[in-house]
Amino acid sequence: MKVAVVGAGTAGLYCIIDLLETLPEFVKIDLIHSRFINPIEVGESSLVNFPHALSCGVDYVHHFDSEELGSTIKYGVKFKNWNKAGFIPFASGSYGIQFDTTKLPQFVIPRLHEMYPNFSERLKTVKEIKSLGKQVSVDGNKYDYVIDCRGYPEDYSDYIITDKVYLDSGIVVKSFTPGDWEYTYHIAHEHGWMFGIPLQKTTGWGYLWNSEVTSELEAQSNPVSYTHLRAHETHE
């Protein structure tokens, strides 16, 4: 049996770790991805199942591996300026991690090569994934199963597009001052809300708004000054 995972972002790597860790060794599993497609460099926040999957699948130990992954501990979520602001912790003894998305492939893929003889990596930009009935073709190469984790599709023609998305625009801002809080930050603001993800050397901020209410120029004038202000208020 042959399985392919297309894409080496968080979804693709999470998927292939789970497949390799749970499926028998006779199942050959390929990771197909392009080094010319880069992740969004803002950092990513996870729930408690993600460090557990890394631990089971690639022997991740936060105490020893956090620097290589640029990761920090996450004990929950903190809300500010919402109707019911406050800290919502994970269950006792549980934690997630916040990590550098650019470092995740560099950390995971070498360990997959070392730990799983049925793992292969193919570097290429996939042009076509096509169902053949009982098999699937990836640019002419046949697999029994293919999991497409490439992210945003190029063609939305077979999607149902809703007009009920209240926050339809966003920008990300990287602060080179690392956050010293152990949670993901969620701040309501006059145009929508924003998140803050503390990493070891930087902090990633995402600023979200509704384009029908707020212009792009108006929205872009706020995040930098807003993040500097909020970064000093995190422990209030």
Where does each model-flagged region fall?
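Predominantly flavin-linked oxidoreductase catalytic cores and closely associated redox partners
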Residues: M115-A219
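N-terminal FAD cofactor-binding segment of flavoenzymes
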Residues: P39-I88
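A structural signal for isolated positions on well-ordered beta-strands in alpha/beta enzyme cores
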Residues: A4, K28-D30, G206
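Short beta-strand to alpha-helix junction loop
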Residues: S92-P110
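N-terminal Rossmann-like FAD-binding beta1-loop-alpha1 element of flavoenzymes
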Residues: V3-P24
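Single conserved hydrophobic/aromatic residue that forms the stacking wall/gate
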Residues: H228-E236
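Glycine-rich FAD pyrophosphate-binding loop
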Residues: E21-E41
